[in-house]
A protein has these predicted regions:
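Short, well-formed alpha-helical segments that are part of the catalytic scaffolds
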Residues: 22-37
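Conserved donor nucleotide-binding strand/loop of the catalytic core
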Residues: 47, 58-87, 91-94
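Hydrophobic helical membrane-anchoring modules
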Residues: 1-11, 180-239
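Acceptor/aglycone-binding surface of glycosyltransferases and processive sugar-polymer synthases
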Residues: 72-88, 99-102, 110-185, 212-222
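Alpha-helix termini
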Residues: 35-41, 88-97
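A conserved acidic beta->alpha catalytic loop
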Residues: 50-58, 107
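Short beta-strand/loop segment that forms part of the nucleotide-sugar
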Residues: 17, 41-52, 69-71
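Donor nucleotide-sugar binding loop of glycosyltransferases
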Residues: 22-25, 53, 110
């Protein structure tokens, strides 16, 4: 695992970016995050969780000036992001911890929207804010998302429109309650259920975000099949 040196300043916000083979988008995502929080006067620490990418993602991350936590092998999203989250856990165990943001590496320039999640948390609207995409980008027939929505309802009674959105912000106190994240694509369902069961309030904020869509292609359907398998496993693990 590689990690660049952390900021010497205590951050107001810590952003953990999940990435796998995102060399073409990760620099734009990091730059958008840094610029957006700087405009709000926030000291931000950006940590990229690289799930052992086979392209130049790790190199691009360091060139962009973010910290890098690289998985020693491909662990899946939940496992790789857990490694990065453990790097920042000491910060959230201190008094007045920073807000923690989670996002995907393929947001590119639309990552400038994420401070609105932090604002929702700071305003006391919720303890865990989940971004709901205001426009649909690609995707399949909604089977995997529908299952995820129903699983969360069954496990903790919440009704979410964006149950597997990876764009989230949380009070620092929430992070220890949801780490380690559920394996692979079960990460977001597990996080939501664990936070709700720990007594934290989960809310949604509509944002105008875009990401790399898989679409109704063979590759897309295989991807959603893997997602659905992980969704079933995370539901079974939390019954």
């Amino acid at each position: 695992m590689d990690a660049a040196s952390a900021s010497t300043h205590r951050p107001d916000v810590v952003v953990i970016v999940s990435a796998f083979n995102e060399a073409d988008r990760i620099a734009a995502t990091v730059t958008a995050l840094r610029d957006a929080f700087a405009r709000d006067g926030e000291e931000v620490r950006i940590v990229v969780a690289d799930d052992h990418s086979t392209d130049t993602t790790a190199h691009v991350v360091l060139e962009a000036g973010a910290e890098l936590v690289r998985a020693p092998r491909n662990l899946g999203k939940g496992g790789a992001t857990t490694l990065a989250a453990r790097e920042v856990l000491p910060l959230v165990l201190e008094p007045d911890p920073p807000v923690v943001v989670l996002c995907d590496g393929d947001l590119a320039d639309t990552a400038v929207q994420l401070p609105r999640l932090v604002q929702a948390v700071r305003a006391g609207e919720c303890d865990l804010a989940v971004a709901a995409f205001s426009r649909r980008v690609g995707g399949g027939f909604g089977v995997a998302v529908g299952y995820a929505r129903a699983a969360i309802r069954r496990l903790c009674g919440l009704e979410l429109t964006a149950p597997i959105s990876g764009q989230r912000a949380m009070r620092g106190e929430v992070l220890p309650a949801v780490v380690p994240f559920a394996p692979r694509f079960g990460m977001e369902i597990g996080m939501t259920v664990d936070a709700a069961r720990a007594g934290f309030r989960v809310g949604e904020v509509e944002l105008d975000l875009t990401h790399r869509a898989t679409g109704r292609t063979l590759k897309g359907f295989l991807h959603r099949g893997r997602q659905l398998k992980d969704f079933v496993l995370v539901e079974l693990s939390r019954r």
